[in-house]
């Protein structure tokens, strides 16, 4: 049986925008984790009785999500800066608020990440995450596409992102958080339908859908149009001979706390990193 949707209450933070969402979802995740593919799928399976859909993309933490979103999508169409177009979704839409490279706040933070809103204004908090090896390979590939980033810049971004990736995995143990593993989501229709049930959403369209062009689409397959065309579980294999990628993996392998967090969800990744643990990085002879 499908779980009941936690409809937001009148007088909530949404009221100032004339909204009383049927379902309001917060979605967190690192870039290159499949966030937008998952969000598009959620939007194609809105809560029963929804009058439309609103997607507030890449919002700024601790600010009003409507004011701080980087882009807006209403009823499946990008609306840019046209905030007034949210009215096209009706008064009881499904709303998704996304945060990139950001973990849900600690329960002891004392305030909601959405300024002007309360915990009751959110039906579910979701974290989209991806296997460490595939995620890190995809991120480095994406960074390579920026001509202004030299190797030191890429290395700095990689290491800071790896640190934040570990924090996000830790938040998956937080009560009330729904984790969506992109690797499993891509490969298993039953995994997807079970998640919809957990979120109180009907199964309307359980397909992977088209490639989303937020963030430039796939790092590896720019020509791919459909999610089923992607080999998302083999990214690390395509990068395993890349020296820059191996340097990032070597540094990550020396962090026992990170490895513990990764092993909880991706033990095969940690097994593959095992030879790097405590190894010499390769400059000169090991003492």
Go through each PLM region and give its residues.
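PAPS-dependent sulfotransferase catalytic core
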Residues: 1-91
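Generic detection of long, well-ordered alpha-helical segments
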Residues: 32, 155-159, 189, 252, ...
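PAPS-dependent sulfotransferase catalytic domain
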Residues: 90, 95, 99-205, 219-233
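Broad structural signal for hydrophobic residues in well-ordered alpha-helices, predominantly aliphatic
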Residues: 42, 116, 195, 261-262
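Residue-level marker of structural boundaries
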Residues: 47, 144-145, 282
């Amino acid at each position: 049986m499908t779980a009941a949707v936690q409809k937001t209450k009148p007088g909530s933070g949404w009221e100032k925008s004339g909204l009383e969402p049927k379902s309001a979802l917060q979605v967190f995740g690192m870039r290159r984790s499949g966030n937008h593919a998952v969000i598009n799928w959620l939007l194609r399976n809105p809560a029963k009785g929804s009058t439309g859909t609103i997607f507030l993309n890449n919002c700024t933490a601790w600010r009003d999500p409507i004011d701080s979103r980087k882009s807006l999508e209403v009823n499946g169409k990008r609306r840019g800066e046209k905030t007034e177009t949210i009215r096209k979704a009706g008064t009881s839409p499904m709303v998704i608020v996304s945060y990139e490279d950001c973990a849900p706040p600690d329960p002891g933070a004392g305030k909601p990440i959405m300024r002007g809103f309360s915990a009751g204004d959110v039906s579910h908090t979701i974290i989209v995450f991806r296997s460490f090896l595939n995620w890190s390979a995809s991120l480095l590939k994406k960074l390579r596409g920026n001509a202004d980033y030299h190797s030191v810049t890429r290395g700095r971004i990689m290491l800071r992102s790896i640190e934040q990736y570990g924090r996000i995995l830790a938040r998956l143990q937080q009560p009330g958080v729904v984790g969506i593993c992109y690797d499993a989501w891509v490969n298993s229709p039953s995994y997807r339908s079970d998640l919809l049930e957990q979120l109180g959403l009907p199964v309307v369209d359980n397909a992977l859908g088209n490639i989303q062009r937020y963030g430039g689409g796939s790092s590896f397959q720019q020509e791919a149009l459909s999610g089923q065309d992607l080999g998302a579980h083999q990214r690390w294999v395509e990068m395993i001979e890349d020296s820059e990628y191996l340097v990032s993996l070597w540094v990550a392998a020396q962090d026992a706390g990170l490895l513990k967090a990764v092993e909880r969800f991706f033990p095969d990744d940690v097994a593959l990193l095992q030879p790097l643990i405590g190894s010499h990085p390769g400059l000169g002879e090991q003492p």
